[in-house]
């Protein structure tokens, strides 16, 4: 694991030095990314707080969709892939359905999605060197459980969005420290 991470870093550094004309704006935004992360997570939490009560009141199920195994994937070697897949899952499957459940929350769900898209964009710009080829079994389990819940899956997934934000934070904190 450590040797492959070192190899990725060396490849990245070689690529950075070998590519003349790279804009400093991108480099600067990446160096500021760790400092901006708490602000981006706060924006996600603020946006979620506007719809949290609605979805948690509608979520009548006792089971947990975002289990500890997902957090373990976030913290493990599949962290990049698990995060990428979960962001895609929320943006493409959960939020489009969530927007259609009540016209009063549509704008707030849309705002939450825009904040998540902003985070994804920053991650892609600054963390492209992370290995993201393998599929996460925990993400597949989340998607399968979501599908089985049918309409109730939207309430479950949206009511647990704060857990997803916490997992993002755990993943990014770990990556920033390394």
Curated annotation (Swiss-Prot):
Which terms in the GO cellular component ontology are assigned? extracellular space
Q: Which SUPFAM superfamilies does its entry note?
A: 4-helical cytokines (SSF47266)
Claim: Disulfide bond is one of the keywords in the record:
yes
Carbohydrate-modified residues are: 134
* A GO BP entry: response to glucocorticoid
> Where in the cell does this protein reside?
Secreted
Q: Which family does it belong to?
A: Belongs to the IL-10 family.
Q: What is this protein called?
A: Interleukin-10
Q: Which organism is it from?
A: Macaca fascicularis (Crab-eating macaque)
Q: What phylogenetic lineage does the species belong to?
A: Eukaryota, Metazoa, Chordata, Craniata, Vertebrata
Name the gene: IL10
């Amino acid at each position: 694991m450590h040797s492959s991470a070192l190899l990725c870093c060396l490849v990245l550094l070689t690529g950075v030095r070998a590519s003349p004309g790279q804009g400093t704006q991108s480099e600067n935004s990446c160096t500021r990314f760790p400092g901006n992360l708490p602000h981006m997570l706060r924006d996600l939490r603020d946006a979620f707080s506007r719809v949290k009560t609605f979805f948690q009141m509608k979520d009548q199920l006792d089971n947990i969709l975002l289990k500890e195994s997902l957090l373990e994937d976030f913290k493990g070697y599949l962290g990049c892939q698990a995060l990428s897949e979960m962001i895609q899952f929320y943006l493409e499957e959960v939020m489009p359905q969530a927007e259609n459940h009540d016209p009063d929350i549509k704008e707030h769900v849309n705002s939450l999605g825009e904040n998540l898209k902003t985070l994804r964009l920053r991650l892609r710009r600054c963390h492209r060197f992370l290995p993201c080829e393998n599929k996460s079994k925990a993400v597949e389990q989340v998607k399968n459980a979501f599908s089985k819940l049918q309409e109730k899956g939207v309430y479950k997934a949206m009511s647990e969005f704060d857990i997803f934000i916490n997992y993002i934070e755990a993943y990014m904190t770990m990556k920033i420290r390394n």
